[in-house]
Curated annotation (Swiss-Prot):
Region named Regulatory loop: 335-355
Enzyme Commission number: 2.1.1.-
Protein name, per record: rRNA N(6)-adenosine-methyltransferase ZCCHC4
Basic and acidic residues compositional bias, start-end: 480-489
Native source organism of the sequence: Rattus norvegicus (Rat)
Catalytic reaction list: adenosine(4220) in 28S rRNA + S-adenosyl-L-methionine = N(6)-methyladenosine(4220) in 28S rRNA + S-adenosyl-L-homocysteine + H(+)
Primary location class: cytoplasm
Gene name, Swiss-Prot/TrEMBL: Zcchc4
Domain DHHC: 393-443
Region (Disordered): 467-489
A cellular-component GO term for this protein: cytoplasm
Record's subcellular location: Cytoplasm; Nucleus, Nucleolus
Residues the entry annotates as binding Zn(2+) 3: C378, C381, H391, C398
Length: 489
């Protein structure tokens, strides 16, 4: 999954400078033990609006998966009390929003479909559904594809329309080049099982690998797109929301995932995840840590110190945010490309290269990147880097993040993008036409540049001061109201 290019600049801003002065952030609930209310996509997340670095007093619950209320309009204040009637109505609504077919029904239909002769295998493009002969009359006026081959059934991502709603799914799929590289790399590293979280095309590639070509690998796909339910048996697919660790088919699906991770005492498994770029890093990190904990439950005591190998595929400008939650992660130079995105494709140069990278806790010197694509090994950094990523003797590192050659700034004491120049007014490097209003990064509470607002040690004092100001204004307002009532009995 990926985000569209028109969101790239705003995403880069979010990733590179941390949280903005204004926006919406995930918040901690006042009562951590209380379950969050549920929307059709599972447990909701608690959010808080932030304006100029200050949190608004009331927090609210909203959908974890949908960033646009047109897709999921759930909204509830944290302190809001709902009647039994409203809770019952919400439960009915959540049930109505679920797919028309249960997981068991999808499996039954799939087993029937693959037994049909080729001439009777039809797919409704209008409804995005495999059709049995009994369904033909109902879909007679729809756009149909006939003679669905076994190969097509094995590649549902090419049969289904991508869900390109950029605020909900942003479903952009790996290009064959990147997909084949990833599958080959996983096999070279010796993995036997791959947990694909939001990576349907990699899941397909692994399952399509011909026996004998390389060591056999198995894959389990976790994805929120219910349409994949009709193409896989229960041991190959679980409908899953990666933003809240919600298995839509309950305990049975959770046990499938658990067994997959804990097989062979957790050895030989890796998690590969490709979240929507517009998703918040914090809830993703929380979810991935729950999957890691699930994996650790199956380990022997001798292996309790080990980490679950992970490939997290995300834009390079989220590096600091990802490493904040997973300090052992490093970013590889490999540029991941997407098949159905005009700008995230191989062969582009300069600023328009794909910004998508692989973050991993596997030592980078073990990961060989393809030399035919221009990657080379830096003996000093002990990792493969892109062609233009030159080693800086001052930083003692290959510093480029975006595939271009970066320049060292002796004032900032670090390498910066080639389009940036040093501004003496701001005392930092920036674009030539920037506004000299000072850096946007740093803490909006105390002004320090070494942490963000959410980690500020003064946040408690700041909140107390804000509360005191609000109370003072409220007392003044009440006093004016009382005086007005006296004057107008």
């Amino acid at each position: 999954m990926a985000a569209p290019m028109d969101c790239l600049e705003s995403l880069e801003g979010e990733g590179s400078v941390g949280r903005r002065a204004s926006g919406v952030e995930v918040a901690l609930p006042s009562n951590p033990g209380a379950p969050a209310p549920q929307c059709p996509h599972g447990p909701t997340l608690l959010f808080v609006k932030v304006s100029q670095g200050k949190e608004e007093p009331r927090k609210f619950y909203a959908c974890s998966a949908c960033r646009d209320r047109k897709d999921c309009n759930f909204f509830q204040w944290e302190d809001e009390k709902l009647s039994e009637a409203r809770l019952a109505a919400r439960e009915i609504h959540n049930q109505r929003c679920q797919p028309p077919l249960s997981r068991a029904q999808c499996i039954e239909r799939y087993l029937s479909f693959i037994q049909l002769p080729l001439t009777q295998r039809k797919f409704c493009r209008s409804c995005q559904q495999l059709l049995l002969p009994a369904d033909w009359r109902e879909h007679g006026e729809h756009q149909l594809s006939a003679d669905i081959s076994t190969t097509q059934i094995a590649r549902p991502s090419q049969l289904l329309y991508p869900l390109e709603n950029k605020k909900t799914h942003a479903q952009y799929l790996f290009a064959d080049r990147s997909c084949q590289f990833l599958a080959g790399l996983l096999a070279t590293l010796g993995f036997r099982r791959v947990l694909c979280v939001g990576a349907p095309r990699l899941h397909e590639q692994i399952r399509l690998t011909a026996p004998g070509e390389k060591p056999d690998m198995r894959s389990l796909l976790l994805d929120i797109d219910f349409r994949y339910s009709q193409f896989y048996l229960e041991e190959s697919f679980c409908r899953y929301n990666m933003f809240n660790h919600h298995f839509f088919d309950g305990k049975a699906a959770l046990e499938v995932c658990k067994a997959f991770l804990q097989e062979e005492e957790g050895k030989g498994v890796i998690m590969v995840t490709d979240p929507p770029f517009g998703g918040l890093v914090e809830p993703l990190a929380v979810t991935f840590k729950k999957l890691i904990a699930m994996w650790k439950e199956g380990q022997s005591q001798d292996d309790s110190h080990k980490e679950l190998p992970i490939f997290w595929i995300f834009p390079y400008f989220f590096e600091s945010r990802i490493c904040q939650f997973f300090p052992s992660f490093c970013m590889l130079d490999y540029q991941v490309d997407y098949d159905n995105h005009a700008l995230y494709k191989h062969g582009k140069t300069g600023r328009k290269q794909s910004p998508v990278r692989i973050f991993t806790n596997i030592p980078p010197n073990k990961i060989i990147l393809p030399s035919e694509e221009g990657y080379r090994f830096c003996s000093v950094c002990q990792r493969y880097v892109s062609r233009e990523n030159q080693h800086c003797v001052h930083c003692n590192s290959c510093t480029s993040k975006d595939g271009r050659k970066w320049s060292h700034c002796f004032f900032c004491k670090k390498c910066v993008k080639p389009s940036w120049i040093h501004c003496n007014t701001c005392n930092r490097c920036a674009l030539p036409d920037h506004s000299c209003l000072g850096p946007k990064d740093g803490c909006f509470i105390c002004g320090s540049l070494d942490h963000k607002r959410s980690n500020c040690p003064s946040i408690g004092a700041s909140q107390r001061a804000n509360n005191a100001v609000r109370k003072q204004k409220q007392r003044k307002s009440n006093k004016i109201r009382r005086e007005a009532l006296k004057d107008n009995p």
